[in-house]
A protein has these predicted regions:
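Bacterial N-terminal signal peptides that target proteins for export
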Residues: 1-6
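General secretory precursor processing signal
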Residues: 9-12, 22, 68, 98
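C-terminal motif of bacterial Sec signal peptides marking the signal peptidase cleavage site
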Residues: 15-18
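N-terminal "mature-domain start" segment
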Residues: 20-92, 174-187
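Short Gly/Thr-rich strand-loop-strand
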Residues: 85-89, 116-153, 187
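A short acidic-to-branched-hydrophobic micro-motif
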Residues: 94-120, 161-165
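A short acidic/glycine-rich loop-to-helix N-cap element
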Residues: 162-176
Length: 187
């Protein structure tokens, strides 16, 4: 009877790893309790490799990036800052900066992936090797590109990926923003 109660508990409560029984078997009452297994941290809320930040209020929001100075980003990207926001779904909040155009002037995404290969997949999505110039510096590798549609700099080291997009065509600007992010977060 105790075995049946424990088996029933296990089957009916998916995802729980243990059951114990207590009660008076003599009178036929059995109670079962379950304990949850310790869970590993969920990295970046299990977001897909190609996840982009979502800022509901758009450029009318004014939430500062916790690891990049607003004026520094404006000076580095060469545009006045009129809005900024963060997406806390990412372990390190993704930061989005706006100037006058509707599209962001800069987007910074730091991904903490479960494996090095997953981080490489993030970089390959943002800066595909077939369309970007390779980057390999201080253990960070990836790609960079700049053209009239904008620039990208995406690198990874171990299971961490850093991706920066800009509406400016110079890839030096996104490189500087990525390096400042890496420095400020001690990555």
């Amino acid at each position: 009877m105790v075995l049946l109660a424990c088996l029933t508990c296990f089957i009916s409560v998916t995802g729980l790893t243990g059951c114990s029984s207590s009660g008076d078997i003599g009178n036929g009452t059995v109670t079962a309790s379950a304990s949850a297994a310790p869970t590993a941290p969920v990295l970046d809320s299990n977001l897909p490799v190609d996840a982009l930040p979502v800022i509901p209020a758009g450029k009318s929001e004014m939430v500062p990036c916790p690891y990049l100075d607003t004026q520094w980003v404006a000076n580095t990207n060469g545009q006045r800052m009129i809005g900024q926001g963060v997406d806390a779904r990412f372990n390190t909040p993704a930061c989005v900066f706006w100037s006058f155009p509707d599209e962001p002037q800069a987007t910074v995404i730091v991904r903490h992936m479960p494996t090095e290969q997953a981080a490489i997949n993030v970089v390959d999505w943002a800066a595909p090797i077939t369309t970007t110039e390779p980057v390999d510096e201080n253990g960070w590798s990836g790609g960079r590109s700049g053209n009239p549609q904008g620039a990208v700099y995406a690198v990874q080291k171990g299971p961490v990926a850093v991706v920066v997009f800009s509406n400016q065509e110079q890839s030096l600007k996104v490189e500087l923003i990525a390096k400042e992010t890496i420095k400020n977060l001690n990555l």
